From Swiss-Prot:
The lineage of its organism: Bacteria, Pseudomonadati, Pseudomonadota, Gammaproteobacteria, Aeromonadales. HAMAP family: PlsY (MF_01043). GO terms for molecular function: acyl-phosphate glycerol-3-phosphate acyltransferase activity. The keyword Transmembrane applies. Residues 193-220 are annotated as: Disordered. This is Glycerol-3-phosphate acyltransferase. It catalyses: an acyl phosphate + sn-glycerol 3-phosphate = a 1-acyl-sn-glycero-3-phosphate + phosphate. It comes from Aeromonas salmonicida (strain A449). Keywords: Cell inner membrane, Cell membrane, Lipid biosynthesis, Lipid metabolism, Membrane, Phospholipid biosynthesis, Phospholipid metabolism, Transferase, Transmembrane, Transmembrane helix. Its EC number is 2.3.1.275.
Length: 220
């Protein structure tokens, strides 16, 4: 392993440590996603807290955190066997960001970004699987879990030299989804559909609570 490869691994981790969800939330005045909603700093939770535009920006930035270092390493002619580990470093940065007290996301979007340079076939297989499961089930977490379970198989069939790092990524993401898996088994996992309505109901409830407390204070 060359010094350039080690440098790229470090840079990939540091880039991954830039939490898009937290930064976008701060800029747009949204609540900190680590302390609200599902407490996960990712696009899905930002969607719950702030709407589609902010969530889309977070999603694109998270994907870019995975794609950019792998493409740059490929451009610098780093050996293919190390490209996958550079992608793993980017995902580790997203999951355990050094700049945000190691409280990161679950790494799905960043992992998708690392797989995009493998080829359009791989990217299409991963995105297609996620979309199909999401549309059929309505569960973002279930779509992510099934996609990462199938990703090593897709990689083995398309570019087997990347199977090991993709398998490592899949294991990391599954571990990060252990709470979602438990909620899915209990039937307590919220669906994507209807989240905005649920959020509006919660806001109305909070406004009612504030009004009630104000009335009680006025009576005193």
């Amino acid at each position: 392993m060359t010094a350039l490869t080690i440098l790229m691994i470090i840079l990939a981790y540091l880039g991954g440590s830039l939490s898009s969800a937290v930064l976008v939330s701060r800029i747009t005045g949204l609540p900190d996603p680590r302390d609200h909603g599902s407490h996960n700093p990712g696009a899905t939770n930002v969607l719950r807290l702030g709407g589609r535009v902010a969530a889309l920006v977070v999603l694109l930035l998270d994907v870019l955190k995975g794609t950019a270092p792998v493409y740059l390493a490929w451009y610098l002619q780093i050996k293919p066997v190390y490209l996958g580990f550079i992608g793993v470093a980017a995902c580790l940065g997203h999951m355990y960001p050094i700049f945000f007290h190691f409280r990161g996301g679950k790494g799905v979007a960043t992992a998708l970004g690392t797989m995009m340079p493998i080829g359009f076939t791989m990217g299409g297989a991963v995105i297609g699987t996620w979309l199909v499961v999401l549309l059929v089930s309505g569960y973002s977490s279930l779509a992510s879990i099934i996609t990462v379970l199938l990703s090593p198989l897709f990689t083995y069939l398309i570019k087997p030299e990347y199977t090991l790092p993709v398998s490592l990524l899949s294991c990391l993401i599954l571990i990060r989804h252990h709470e979602n898996i438990a909620r899915l088994l209990k039937g307590e996992e919220p669906r994507v559909w209807g989240r905005q309505a649920q959020r509006r109901q919660e806001e109305v409830g909070e406004m009612d609570d504030v009004a009630q407390k104000r009335d009680e204070r006025d009576k005193k």
